[in-house]
Amino acid sequence: MNSASLVGRSILVCEDEPLIALSIANAFADVGAQIVTARSFASALIAVENEVPAAVILDHALSDGESSQFRKRLKQRNIPYVLHSGYSNLDGACSNAVHVPKPANPDVLVTAVLGLLQRRRPTLHLNL
C-alpha cells in the first residue's frame, strides 16, 4: 500500500499541542488525506460520531484526560489508531495499536497508518 491509498481518506488527529498537530496534519494532507483535528477527547468523540475516520493519530494524554476510554470506543467501532505519545509506560495501551514515541517525524506516522490499513485490507482468495 502506498501513500496514494490515503487520498481522500479521513484521518483524525487527536493532539493538544498546536504545532505538533499542524505538523502531523500537513504530513497527511501532503499525501491527499482529509484531516480532522481534535484537541480534547470530548471533541474527538464528536468527530468519530460524525464521520468514521480511516484511522486516528492519538496522543495518550489530552487536555481532558487520558486515552483509555477513547481507545475503548475506537476498538468498539473497529477504527485503527496509532498511539503517538511521549509516555514510555502505557500499561497495555498499545496492545491493539502501533506506538510511535514522541518526538517523531510525521512521515513515520503516515507510514504507520499505511501499515495499519494494509493489515486491515481484505484478502481475496481465488480457488482455481
Where would I find each of the regions flagged by the language model?
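Non-catalytic signal-transmission and effector/linker regions of two-component phosphorelay proteins
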Residues: M1-L12, A93-C94, N105-L128
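Alpha-helical interaction/dimerization surfaces of two-component signaling modules
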Residues: N26-F28, A47, R73
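Two-component/phosphorelay signaling modules centered on CheY-like receiver
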Residues: P18-V36
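A Lys-centered signature of the CheY-like receiver
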Residues: K102
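Conserved phosphotransfer microenvironments
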Residues: L58-K75
